[in-house]
């Protein structure tokens, strides 16, 4: 079978798919060489048509095959299905497409044979219709033709007789050979059957003995394996139960240890938190006390500084007054000139001021909260030193 496909070919607006196939009956009846040559020729023509035409159509394909001396006819019967039994000539083409689908038979147009006693010129003259002179060669008489026919018939009869004799000889030789081969085959078959029966009996006996031994061995092995399997299963179950119990005990102990560790960690965290809070409270209290002490010390220092300044101012004033009084009481010899009135007024003012006593610093006491004993003692010492230094008799030199 040969195929030739033209994907772009169109026959009345449809694509062509061409397939060449040869019926099986003709392939069996006719010689193979002749059929293959015809199929090859048709396939070559199809390939040439496909290569020569860009868009191959069914009409163009018919023209190409007609020019090559082939005739194309649509196949209507169901030969491709294998139902027809008559002998058909030519090759079968299967064309698939929308409008050109179907089977087509292609065969070579046979040339007219030349009759005996006629030349090609006479045939050409008859076909063309022109009157041409006959050949000078005379025709054979009818008697010769009859003699030739009889000779052919005799020859055919002799050939048939020879064929029949050869067939009879062949059948006799084949029948003798067949009888001999049959006897030999029967003897061989009987010997083979007896040997097979003996071998089968022996094999059956051996197989029965082996099966009995195997069954006994299997039964004993099964019983032993069952008992061993049961004991093994029991030991396995016991070991598994023990391992499970041990695992449970270990897991419980681990859980208890973890719980204890967690409780200890919580207690430690709580103790650390309490210690931190206590330290924070103590630090806050110490900061408060230190701040109070600093405020108290600063206030004391400020009071002392103020008292010292007042004492210095008073001592200076007293020294000035004394100096003035001393200068007034003891005048110098050189200074015998009368003093002006302004000096007299100033001296009178000084006397009046002298008559008035200077203000003494008042001892101030500040109540301090009883926080610690050390700062209170220091405060008392400071007050004592202040009172001693603040006496009117303690004067600094100007």
Curated annotation (Swiss-Prot):
Provide the free-text tissue specificity comment from this protein's UniProt record.
Testis-specific. Specifically expressed in haploid germ cells.
Q: Keyword Phosphoprotein: yes or no?
A: yes
Instruction: List the residue ranges of the region (Disordered).
Output: 115-398
The Gene Ontology CC terms held by the record are: chromatin; male germ cell nucleus; nucleus
**Entry's Gene Ontology BP terms:** chromosome condensation; nucleus organization; sperm DNA condensation; spermatid nucleus elongation
Q: List the disulfide bonds.
A: none
A GO MF annotation of the entry reads:
DNA binding
Where, per UniProt, does this protein localize? Nucleus; Chromosome
Q: Where is the composition biased (Basic residues)?
A: 137-149, 157-171, 233-243
Task: Locate the Phosphoserine modifications and list their residues.
Answer: 38
Per UniProt, the ranges with Basic and acidic residues bias are: 244-285, 298-362
Return the Polar residues bias intervals: 119-130, 384-398
Print the keywords alphabetically: ATP-binding, Chromosome, Coiled coil, Developmental protein, Differentiation, DNA condensation, DNA-binding, Nucleotide-binding, Nucleus, Phosphoprotein, Spermatogenesis
Report which residue ranges the record marks as coiled coil: 241-312
List compositional bias (Low complexity) regions by residue number: 204-232
Q: Which domain of life is it from?
A: Eukaryota
General function of this protein? Essential for normal spermatogenesis and male fertility. Required for proper cell restructuring and DNA condensation during the elongation phase of spermiogenesis. Involved in the histone-protamine transition of sperm chromatin and the subsequent production of functional sperm. Binds both double-stranded and single-stranded DNA, ATP and protamine-1.
What family, per the record?
Belongs to the histone H1/H5 family.
Q: What is this protein called?
A: Testis-specific H1 histone
